Amino acid sequence: MEKSSNRFLSIQTYMELLQEAQNKTQHKYVKDFITSYNFVVLPITENIGHRASIYIEEYSIPSGLRAGDAIIAATAVENNLTLISSNIKHFKSIKDLKFKGFKP
């Protein structure tokens, strides 16, 4: 992976990565990866929270969108960023989201 100063991560994504760690060594690996590739962790703002709640109302039933993914999508939209994820099912239907899906 090429280093760049243009990498952003929702605080929600960061917390999900840490949550999946099995031990402190894996926590350190996640933190070191985020730091070494210059990711900027974006906070949850009032606007992100509001937009995420709208996404839940609109997309939770038809696409199964959950709160964490709504926060991630809202963070991307509020910061005018393209969201890149393999979670195509939950994100592809969000109309105002710039989304690029991939298969791992």
Kindly label every feature range from the protein language model.
Residues 1-63, 67-81, 98:
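PIN-domain endoribonuclease scaffold, especially VapC-family toxins
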Residues 10, 65-66, 87-88, 103-104:
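Histidine- and aromatic-rich ligand-binding microenvironments
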Residues 16, 90-91:
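Short, active-site-adjacent cap segments at secondary-structure transitions
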Residues 21, 95, 103:
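Short, flexible helix/strand-to-coil boundary loops that buttress conserved ligand/catalytic motifs
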Residues 82, 89:
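Flexible glycine-rich beta->alpha loop in the catalytic core of nucleotide-sugar glycosyltransferases
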